Structures are given as C-alpha cells and as structure tokens.
Amino acid sequence: MGCFITFEGIEGCGKTTQIKLLEQHLAEKGFKVLLTREPGGCPIADQIRAILLDAANSAMTPSAELLLYAAARAQHVEEVIKPALADDCIVLCDRFTDATVAYQGYGRGLDLDSIGYLNQLATSGLKPQLTILLDCPVEVGLKRALARINGISAGAREERFELESTLFHQKVRNGYLKLAENEKGRFLIVDGGTNVDETRVAVTTAVIGRLNGN
C-alpha cells in the first residue's frame, strides 16, 4: 500500500502552493505520486465542487453543504484515492475529512458526531497517515485569498467561503487547532505565515522523515 498525506488550513494559508511543491520534490526523488483535491478530484466530485464553491449559491443550508461534501468524498475515495494507494502511490490530497469537521462542524456549528458518521461512511474508515496543517492568522490568509480571487475572471471564481465573515474563519482556524491537539501523532502544524521557501523546507523535511519511518 502507498501513503496518504493530506494538507489542511484556512483560506489563503498556502497549502495549495505547498502541496504542489511537495509533489514536485517527491517526483524528483523517484516516488510515485498522485496529487488530488477536495471537493473534486474526479468528474462527479468536480461537478459537486462547482455547486459548493459558487458564490451564487448563498442560500445553501449547512446541512445541504455537509451532505454534498460527503457525496463528493465518497466518489473521490472509491474512484481515485483507494486505487492509487493500492498501486503504491503517495497520495497528496488538498483537503479531506478534517476540513469538513473544521468548516461544517466548528465553522457552521453542525453536530460533530453526525459529521464523524458521514465522514466514516464516505471514506469507509480511510484516514491519512500524515496531515500537514498550514496555520496562519485569519487576516493574513483572507488577504492572500482575496488577492488571488481578484486576479481571476468573475465567471471562474470559486469564492463562496472566502466571502464568509472573519468570525467564521476564526472558528474554522480554532477547529483545526483543536483537531491537531487531539491527534498529535497524525498532525504536523507548519507556520503558513512565513515565506514560501521556509514553509517548503519545513514541509518536505517532515514528509521525508515520515516516509523514512522517523
């Protein structure tokens, strides 16, 4: 079996940049790597992603949002992640079940036990061996995220979460930190507020160490 590594964090924390840099580094070292993301990662899940991240869908209820994430994840896990792991790939996933706990649980206030049940159902119990949490202050993350969005044409923007309140994003950040505190063996918190290269070194060092059994 391969190795399953996830990246988590608030909007603008730098995880998408760092996961791509890690993919490149591991590929150069000769590892077989698959980079994927949630929501999305396969055609059906990508269609659900378009619904979830469209700012025009502001009337979406928290429960509907949660169930859509679970549906996208169930398809993604069976179609993409499990086959790649069975093929001895290192699977790098930009967000996974922890994002649902942080955003829909701590951010939206939905019941954590219900979220846990849905995550279990959608993944058949699959959990990452390592989760990199890129942590940064909410103000820093949102400034980066909004700057990125403003550089994208209006019709291609995925901005429903970026437009949420600062309080919402603070709840999400706090949720992530609680998750990391509760599962110290799986989580690695990396400062996402530093420059890209410093963060890259911290991430690659940790991942190579984990792959080498350290």
Curated annotation (Swiss-Prot):
Gene Ontology molecular-function annotations: ATP binding; dTMP kinase activity
Domain of life: Bacteria
Residues at which ATP binds: G9, I10, E11, G12, C13, G14, K15, T16
EC category name: transferase
Catalysed reaction equations from the record: dTMP + ATP = dTDP + ADP
Coiled-coil positions: none
Record key words, sorted: ATP-binding, Kinase, Nucleotide biosynthesis, Nucleotide-binding, Transferase
Record's GO cellular component terms: cytosol
InterPro entries: P-loop_NTPase, Thymidylate_kin-like_dom, Thymidylate_kinase
GO biological process: dTDP biosynthetic process; dTTP biosynthetic process; dUDP biosynthetic process
UniProt key word Cell membrane: no
EC number: 2.7.4.9
Similarity comment: family membership: Belongs to the thymidylate kinase family.
Free-text function comment from the UniProt entry: Phosphorylation of dTMP to form dTDP in both de novo and salvage pathways of dTTP synthesis.
Protein name: Thymidylate kinase
Organism: Geotalea daltonii (strain DSM 22248 / JCM 15807 / FRC-32)
Gene name of the encoded protein: tmk
